[in-house]
A protein has these predicted regions:
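Short, small-residue-biased leader/transition segments that mark boundaries at the very start
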Residues: 2-3
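C-terminal catalytic domain of photolyase/cryptochrome flavoproteins
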Residues: 12-235
Length: 235
């Protein structure tokens, strides 16, 4: 429940009490061990790791801008009129409820904002403004570290970016104009930041894929990306 998550993040709900209740509920209701373990791991594993990163490296993360991006977030990213269907859906959902799932935050909103080269401080502010469970200790590592890779890899070995293919596979959104724009931005990003990606064994092949791409397809991707960026940066 999102509202319990808010109480947990601010410290009004004790994590030990929640763990005790969860374990007892799992025992009484014969919940599969893998489901119980996954839930508990999020509470005392990943969640505490994020808290630890904030305490130890939060100041470093929030004052770094690895990519050097300075663009402001335009109005369309607040009212859900970007024309990018999965993104607009997530924006409208968080506007209505104050909450979107972690994967939506990371792989839809954060992913697309990184491809648009927004200032990480702007991205941090956006998430703090729209999320009911937003607190500084949660958002600093999740935005500057995971989502925008502004810390240069303190928390992860690669940025969480993808083409539209990942979004399509993980959802029921159909291909369309939005996916053409997303792919254009993705390949533009790979090309523009090739000096970084070529050194990463997990992503080097994507640079090679772009280099081997048909010249007309390559130019179409880049033109689509530039047209979209010019549009949003001139709102």
């Amino acid at each position: 429940d999102v509202y319990k998550r808010q109480l947990l993040n601010v410290g009004l709900l004790n994590i030990k009490d929640l763990l005790d209740i969860s374990i007892e509920f799992s025992r009484v209701n014969d919940i599969p061990i893998n489901s119980t373990e996954g839930f508990i791991r999020q509470l005392i594993g990943w969640r505490e790791f994020i808290r630890g990163i904030y305490i130890a490296k939060g100041s470093f993360e929030r004052t770094n801008n690895f990519w050097g991006f300075k663009s402001k977030i335009p109005k369309s990213f607040y009212d859900g009129t970007t024309g990018i269907e999965p993104l607009d859906s997530s924006i409208k959902k968080v506007s209505d409820t104050g909450y979107i799932h972690h994967i939506e935050r990371l792989m839809i909103v954060g992913n697309f904002m990184l491809l648009c080269e927004f200032d990480p401080d702007e991205v941090y502010r956006w998430f703090m403004e729209v999320s009911i469970d937003s607190f500084d200790w949660v958002m600093v590592p999740n935005v500057y570290g995971m989502s925008q890779f502004a810390d240069g890899g303190l928390m992860s070995t690669k940025p969480y970016i993808s083409s539209s293919n990942y979004i399509s596979k993980m959802s029921d959104y159909k291909k369309g104009n939005w996916s053409d724009i997303w792919d254009g931005l993705f390949w533009r990003f790979m090309d523009k930041q090739r000096s970084f990606f070529i050194k990463n064994p997990r992503l080097r092949m994507l640079v090679n894929t772009f280099d081997k791409m048909d010249i007309n397809k390559k130019q179409r991707h880049l033109l689509t990306a530039e047209n979209f960026l010019n549009k949003i940066h001139n709102e």
